[in-house]
Curated annotation (Swiss-Prot):
Alphabetized Gene3D superfamilies for the sequence: Vaccinia Virus protein VP39 (3.40.50.150)
Organism of derivation: Schizosaccharomyces pombe (strain 972 / ATCC 24843) (Fission yeast)
The keyword Chaperone is assigned to this record: no
A single GO molecular function term of this UniProt record: S-adenosylmethionine-dependent methyltransferase activity
Pfam families: CARME
Chain positions recorded as carnosine binding sites: D266, H297, Y356
Subcellular localization, as worded in the UniProt entry: Cytoplasm; Nucleus
UniProt-recorded name of the protein: Carnosine N-methyltransferase
Amino acid sequence: MEYDEEEVKVLKEVLSAFFLYRQYAHTITQQKRKSMSRLSFEHKDLLLQDSDNNFLKHLSRIDQCIEQNSVLAEAIANAAIPVFCSDFDQNELFHVNVDMMQKVSSTLKQIARDWSTECVEERRTTYAPFIEELNSLFPSDSIDRSKIRVLVPGSGLGRLAFDIAVEGFACQGNEFSYFMLLTSHFILNCVKQENQFLVYPYIHSFSNHVMRDDQVRSLNIPDAVPSQYLRNSQNFSMAAGDFLEVYGTEESRDSFQVVATCFFIDTTKNILDYLDTIKNCLVDGGYWINLGPLLYHFESEGTSNSNSDSQQQPFVELTLEQLFYVMDSMGFEVLKHNSVDTTYMGDKRSMLEWIYHPHYWVCRLQKSKLRFQ
């Protein structure tokens, strides 16, 4: 792969973040120990009185979990180097900020969501509707599914795209984040057996745990080995890059029979740009399947007083009612529409879970019915 100078810099920062995970995560437990050392004698004694289950021993258990997570984080980075950045030198790691380090922790949690058995119910709620709809629209006994091209923008760690490809469709995932791209490359291409790795996704937060064991419990990943299912690589591919830039071009016009967006359409500054791009890459009569909220990621940026270049860009956040009106004007005929309740990277043992009420719809693009070209 070839990247420009700025992309190479970002890649090296992301790779460095994976290699620095061990150091960063241990810093957190070290800070906890320092904080404890400043407690009064009485308070310290309360936390240490149980010799088998005191707070310092719990921190030591977390340190052991960090070591296991580091094995996975470094395996991801090592697998990515020859493919994405062959001149990367592990002896010259880039300085990365806390935000990037937190993205490594979040990526480990995302691995659990997409590729562990424990999180299968959350995937069933959010991914199964796509599979069921595709199977209904394109029955395998009457249609050659390998001729049906499905695009999954914002494909993350590739699980939805993988599940679609397993059903026989020609599926392409698209992802912009290098954290997701490097990790999905590892899962999709490098893992050799089920449950090959342990991940401890819940150790990075000390809040809302009922039991100490809840915080330090491990999950096995992956629950499926993609390389064993996707022997015909023509049925599955991943495309790196910004959705608007990759699929808003003349070359991408009328390229897909289906676009499947899951927790995605609120990740842009101007949602109308996404609609234009979906319309561009879908064939006439093609289907757009969506499930997700409208939690606009750039809303606060759009209301800031900054004079930066990004601030000069249009920010458009529509209600669902407004969105459906615009979709109708652009030729999207809504065939199905309902809502579901789901968590996102939830923890069933936690005292706190955010419940989303995302809407699900299936649209058919009728380009002959466009009110606006």
